Amino acid sequence: MSTKFKSEEVTANLNYKDLFKKFTNLNNLKDYLPNEVEEFESSTDNCSFKIEQLPKMSLQMTEKIAYSHIKFESNESQIPFDMYCYLNKNDDNTTNVFLEVNMEVNFMMKMLVQKPINIFLEKFTEIIKKI
């Protein structure tokens, strides 16, 4: 069953080009992760991490549409998923951002992952607001 989790749209105090550049190097993510994320490891195009009750997850950047969105897909994770980071130019100095996580999970697994994923999205967007 396909399940979608979406963050609220927030505003980053950085222009869309600089924000895109920052988010397309996964080594930069460590500076923005919420406390609920543990065991974070990264390279330029890959990262892995653990969130609360969920198994360790791995992401690989698979698509970069300049200044528009970045797609990450699960890589060697127990739960198949992808995550999109959408960037929308607001003005010369700010960018609107929202995240979307798509997972193939059954109803029982959805109930298990819903809270940790929503917490992750909420915490991550709070951090984006502070950029």
Model-derived regions: residue spans:
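Intrinsic-disorder/low-complexity, polar/charged segments enriched in Ser/Thr/Lys/Arg/Asp/Glu/Gln
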Residues: 3-9, 46, 56, 82, ...
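Hydrophobic pocket/interface hotspot
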Residues: 19-23, 29, 47, 61, ...
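Short amphipathic alpha-helical segments
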Residues: 15-21, 53, 112-116, 120
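Amphipathic alpha-helical hairpins
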Residues: 10, 32, 69-70, 115, ...
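Hydrophobic-ligand binding "helix-grip"
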Residues: 52-94, 102
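Ser/Thr- and Asn-enriched, surface-exposed coil loops between beta-strands
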Residues: 41-45, 65-68
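Hydrophobic ligand-binding cavity/cleft-lining segments
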Residues: 1-41
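A conserved amphipathic terminal alpha-helix motif
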Residues: 102-131
